[in-house]
Amino acid sequence: MGQKTNPISLRLQNVNRNFDSCWYSDYFYAKCFSRDLYLNNYINTFFKLYRLPQARVCVNFGIQNIKVYPFFCIPKASRVSLAKNLGLFQHLSKAWNSSPKYFVSSKSKQLSQLKINDASLPVNNLNNNLFFNSSKHNEIRNKQNFFHNLELNKLNLSFKNSAYSDVKNYSFLENISAKLLLNFKEKSVINEVYYTTTNLGQIGNNISTNSIYSKQDMSDNSSKSLLKMLLREYYKSSDNKSSILYENKSPKSLENIFGKINEVSNINKKNLYLLNSETDNIPNLYKRKSKPTKFLRNEHNKVIEDKKTSLYFMPDSNQIKNDIYQGKISKISSISNNSKDSLTDYNLHLYQAYLHNILGNSKSLVSRNQFKYKNYIENFLSSQYNIDSQLFPFISKQNWQSAGFIADEIVYFIERRVSFSRIKNRILRQASMQSYVRGIRITCSGRVGGKSKKAQRATQECVKYGETSLHVFECKIDFASRIANTSFGLVGIKVWICFK
């Protein structure tokens, strides 16, 4: 019996036994195969240059577009537990060093170099141990010290604002998910300021900058809810019911109003950026039932009249210039009519330092739409093949969904000089607990002795568990190979996983 034209159909059974799939695979096989190899090589090389974890890439070739699905693994819970069992306490704070921090922009790292010149007004930093093994009273104590210092700052705002007027960096809001602000029903701990006056001459007298924090609100709310409250002061929700009421909407009178607001709130010469809803929409900042905001551009002294506009601070100056050039953002030099609070620059500076301490240690995940290299890769692949290319990155928390994820775990611990015999015992114990895994086979070649004397010798060790038959069509085998760079040389790792 001769070889089948399409032998892969024997394993796929009822999926690939159609006439059209047979001639399509024969005619376009070489072209699709070369593109698949190129896309896998390009994406993994691109991620490697930016120190991203190696992804499992799946490509779907269509008639009018190409869809690429890279799958990343962020096994925080399993890696931390495995590090504890192997005794890597000194590396415990970096147990997920190959995961979410590479999805965070480098602009947020600039805040770590931000220094406060005044020694009498320190900002307490949150320790890294707070997220692993510290008690709850340490977290509450840090919050109380922060808010206590914030109250002391209110007494010296007159001369402190001039010192921090040039320090205006909103990059700490770049990677905060806007979903935290949706369905926000809790009472804010910050007293909001309402502009409800109709007299143009008395508007300056009705503005206040109260930011009083009660101890009861601090004890009841967790750090996540506190982060929501702080973010709400920057993202003005579309559900605001109070706004400035104008009787005379001439450009001259409105400029006087904004001038008085700037004098009281000390935010003059400050550029605020509003998203133009005609060219770009941000659905994450609004609820599903809410209508898109409509506001006019600030040309020929025109004023925004919509009462449901919201502010969106763009953190990157280069990104702002590009978006303004493309017409996505309309730059204005005034405040929208629904702005409630008038926080000073020094308070904004303290919010930056406090939020950066939270976000710098939490290593929170990001959604698919916030992947910073998505547009770049799509544009490059589209121009390369003259066809629409789409990238859909996914993040997985379970490392047993692919053999490549298990190989990355082995590489992580071998590079930290953990012997392969200790690693295989932990992995086989985890494999027995997975209901959808039929068997696993791991082969390691090189100096895999760890810190012992056996590390001087290069050996090849293999471990098997369950059924991993490579010559049976019914077995769903997944294969991956990795290379670990150790101080003793390179170590080759191969993993086979058989799924049920």
Curated annotation (Swiss-Prot):
GO terms for biological process: translation. It is found in: Mitochondrion. Gene3D superfamilies: Ribosomal protein S3, C-terminal domain. GO terms for cellular component: mitochondrion; ribonucleoprotein complex; ribosome. GO terms for molecular function: RNA binding; structural constituent of ribosome. Its main location: mitochondrion. Keywords: Mitochondrion, Ribonucleoprotein, Ribosomal protein. It holds the Pfam family Ribosomal_S3_C. Belongs to the universal ribosomal protein uS3 family. PANTHER family: RIBOSOMAL PROTEIN S3, MITOCHONDRIAL, SMALL RIBOSOMAL SUBUNIT PROTEIN US3M. This is Small ribosomal subunit protein uS3m. The lineage of its organism: Eukaryota, Viridiplantae, Chlorophyta, core chlorophytes, Trebouxiophyceae.
